[in-house]
Swiss-Prot record:
Membrane topology: Peripheral membrane protein
A Pfam entry, by short name: EFG_C
Keyword annotations of the record: Cell inner membrane, Cell membrane, GTP-binding, Hydrolase, Membrane, Nucleotide-binding, Protein biosynthesis
Organism: Helicobacter pylori (strain P12)
Name used for this protein in its record: Elongation factor 4
Reaction catalysed by this enzyme: GTP + H2O = GDP + phosphate + H(+)
Subcellular location: Cell inner membrane
Record CDD domains: EF4_II (cd03699), EF4_III (cd16260), LepA (cd01890), lepA_C (cd03709)
GO term, biological process aspect, one: positive regulation of translation
SUPFAM superfamilies reported for this sequence: EF-G C-terminal domain-like (SSF54980), P-loop containing nucleoside triphosphate hydrolases (SSF52540), Translation proteins (SSF50447)
The EC number(s) this enzyme carries: 3.6.5.n1
Amino acid sequence: MKEKTPTPMKNIRNFSIIAHIDHGKSTLADCLIAECNAISNREMTSQVMDTMDIEKERGITIKAQSVRLNYTFKGEDYVLNLIDTPGHVDFSYEVSRSLCSCEGALLVVDATQGVEAQTIANTYIALDNNLEILPVINKIDLPNANVLEIKQDIEDTIGIDCSNANEVSAKAKLGIKDLLEKIITTIPAPSGDPNAPLKALIYDSWFDNYLGALALVRIMDGSINTEQEILVMGTGKKHGVLGLYYPNPLKKIPTKSLECGEIGIVSLGLKSVTDIAVGDTLTDAKNPTPKPIEGFMPAKPFVFAGLYPIETDRFEDLREALLKLQLNDCALNFEPESSVALGFGFRVGFLGLLHMEVIKERLEREFGLNLIATAPTVVYEVHLTDNSIKYVQNPSELPPENHIACIKEPFVRATIITPSEFLGNLMQLLNNKRGIQEKMEYLNQSRVMLTYSLPSNEIVMDFYDKLKSCTKGYASFDYEPIENREAHLVKLDVRVAGDVVDALSIIIDKNKAYEKGRALVETMKELIPRQLFEVAIQASVGNKIIARETIKSVGKNVTAKCYGGDITRKRKLLEKQKEGKKRMKAIGKVELPQEAFLAILKID
């Protein structure tokens, strides 16, 4: 394959697609790829940008993918670099770093649904990065599409002029050519100095079984070639370049160099993505750039949960599996922990609940593990009486009550857009979740935008499911962490047969403790199988028992073998059984079924 002449910077366009879940982003990406003939019709599959099975099944994008497209317009050859971004709230860090490598973004809105909360959040990230925003109304072929109302909706909500918005249908392939031409004429070419020292931004990284850890980079200044030695500015380590490629969902395209303004994949032969952290800067080892690229924050976990293998001898397999997933996911972090009830496992940090579900599902599906997940928690700031501060993410680490001066919990600012008919139900839900209303505005007659501050631990349990059920699935939701605020929190323990089951402990608002404790013991009573001895299930705060249920013992007919009517013989056997039950009650261990741990997540 002969080496192509480098594309001049004025003919490069780097753009990304911002859209809410289900607004047709991946389908639109497929259309653009097909229109530019980047993939032959034979190899084209739907959602070609979503490479994980779990992405295709759930219809969501998790890892941001990129593709290089060639397009000829008015006799000139252009290179269009499309960076696909996830749309779900948990993956907004993927969005922010993808947007840093672009000059423009397509704001895709479903013609039947209008602007959603997540879209607004990501559009603001794009505007903060000074991106040119092109509004695109998708699904115009649907009978209930209302293009004029949606344009007005975008103008009112985000403040972007939509008089010339592109109207497309990715499914029916309408308006795709016009959209490509609009990208070329409207989105600015990349800026940067081709003669300056190399400065490249890593905006994604993943692990390849053959090439090791790969970095997806945007060249901001200078250029990179295969003979170069590279310095990773964050780690201070130097590496030789083993290979350079242009991104394509099916097969990477090798190249000798990546020029200023281009997007490409760099292989440095590294064993883990931790050596090429996302947001880090690559530069030339001999002639480094004076300052790395600014404005990047490492992804911080928001939710923590314990993951334990059901087969206790598979602890090492779980460690291996987590390490492999971490190669691809710099937001995932974990440390070993042990629980009296569940044995050895890991405390794992996630970006949010969807991230936690996806990781758990991948561990079970790709590595064949059976796992128990404990109730998710957030990080609490505990001020102790000796003026020190302790950060607690596991309820079992909470110090005794008499050592605590106060506890602060993290709050988030939640933005919710809902049809106005569900407003009453929604406000009731938010009040139950200890929400504080900050703002309420009507976007039009039928849609309302609410802004609330909420404690993080109220949204990590089941808030998303409840939000969807009380608005029949129509509300959309986005949040950003704001600050820690003082709260009245206590640790609620569950005791089974007198022993605290550490994996079931939760930190909860004091006013909700009795209600939750009552619900917990009642649910546990249903789930724990009857034993040969009586089992007490108690909920306690500190040393105070606040709720109790008893599982009656299974009666075994010990007198069945006694024929004839000797009552003393029967009495002797019954006394012996009573003694045995007493002893079992003292030393007996109760096996807790996995459903008991899952039940905690589902209890209001």
